[in-house]
């Protein structure tokens, strides 16, 4: 196990609460599922790493746009990464803009949608996705349940933009066998005020699905608003998720990532009682690795060669071997030291230099 030796920044009080949640859950490491065949959902749908997974996808930030120690503006998310498990060389799907990355996370392909973020079934690439298999097909064939929550979506399975709801951030309506299936559409729901519907469902194992997806609106996900707004939003939401009945009493995990970056890695963090604490890996992951992890966890067939060949992220869970590779982003000089240097110009030079050094290091490693 590779432990991180860096200083924990930001909201220590919130982190202490989350660590307490992990201890209260009383969990040990993950256990094998015990069966290689299709699973039928009972009281618990046992997985290798977790039995319940909540995925939250944020918007349009490189890793060091988030982490405060390399130029970012999100102290809460920085503290969360320091306390739990971060993949700091996660390269999303190496494509822009948003839509193809959301499709990678749910369909195992960008379907040729580089440069496109239009409506479902609106051009050649979205038609390819429309006719493709997807993660919901795999989950249901494995006897698992799922539900997707969209902040500010007007109604179930809504397939057009509306206010701060962007349909391109709701990948599930891009697949024909979901969007035209009434029972499946009933599982793509508005998240309610402050993600209230999601939190209510996490209040019991009878209402929580095995696979839960949450897309915040275009302000809270940092797409249209400052990073500080999204960070504050997450500082309220994440502790509520971790303090829910499902997270306190079952083998549940939370995965937070960003849909895309701009030539640099994105934030990808695992949180929960079954996740290694103060852990980091610089192994090369992508959005396909998220699918590979879900498939490995529940013994599901891959959707495409992309997720089939992608490394899963099992190393972030207790009892699983580390890939043994760590290359942390460089830390700028401590703030106390910077403040001691006379003249605002010197401060600007030092801070700017630290950020440029980080960026140059990233370029040289690509």
Residue spans of the language-model regions?
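N-terminal pro-sequences and low-complexity stem/linker regions of secreted or lumenal proteins
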Residues: 31-325
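Secretory targeting signatures
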Residues: 1-45, 324-366
């Amino acid at each position: 196990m590779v432990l991180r030796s860096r200083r924990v920044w930001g909201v220590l009080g919130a982190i202490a609460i989350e660590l307490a949640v992990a201890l209260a859950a009383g969990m040990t490491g993950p256990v094998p599922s015990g069966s290689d065949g299709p699973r039928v959902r009972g009281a618990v749908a046992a997985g290798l790493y977790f039995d319940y997974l909540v995925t939250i996808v944020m918007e349009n930030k490189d890793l060091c746009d988030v982490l405060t120690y390399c130029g970012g503006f999100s102290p809460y998310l920085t503290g969360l990464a320091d306390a739990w498990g971060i993949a700091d060389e996660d390269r999303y799907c190496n494509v822009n803009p948003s839509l193809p990355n959301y499709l990678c996370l749910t369909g195992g392909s960008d379907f040729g949608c580089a440069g496109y973020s239009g409506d479902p079934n609106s051009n050649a690439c979205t038609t390819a996705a429309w006719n493709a298999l997807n993660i919901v097909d795999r989950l249901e064939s494995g006897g698992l349940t799922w539900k997707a929550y969209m902040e500010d979506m007007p109604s179930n399975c809504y397939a057009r933009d509306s206010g701060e709801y962007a349909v391109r951030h709701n990948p599930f309506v891009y697949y024909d066998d979901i969007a035209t299936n009434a029972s499946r559409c009933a599982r793509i729901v508005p998240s309610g005020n402050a993600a209230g519907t999601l939190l209510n469902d996490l209040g019991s194992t009878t209402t929580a699905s095995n696979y839960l997806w949450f897309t915040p609106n275009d302000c809270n996900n940092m797409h249209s608003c400052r990073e500080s707004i999204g960070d504050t939003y997450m500082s309220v939401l994440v502790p509520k998720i971790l303090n829910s009945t499902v997270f306190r009493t079952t083998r549940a995990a939370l995965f937070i990532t960003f849909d895309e970056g701009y030539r640099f890695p994105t934030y990808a963090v695992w949180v929960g009682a079954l996740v290694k604490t103060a852990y980091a890996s610089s192994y090369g992951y992508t959005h396909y690795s998220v699918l590979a992890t879900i498939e490995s966890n529940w013994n599901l067939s891959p959707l495409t060669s992309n997720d089939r060949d992608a490394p899963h992220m099992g190393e972030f869970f207790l009892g699983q071997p580390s890939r043994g590779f760590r290359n942390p982003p460089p830390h700028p000089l401590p703030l106390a030291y910077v403040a001691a240097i006379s003249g605002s110009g010197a401060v600007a030079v030092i801070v700017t230099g630290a950020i440029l050094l980080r960026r140059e290091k990233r370029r040289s490693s690509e």
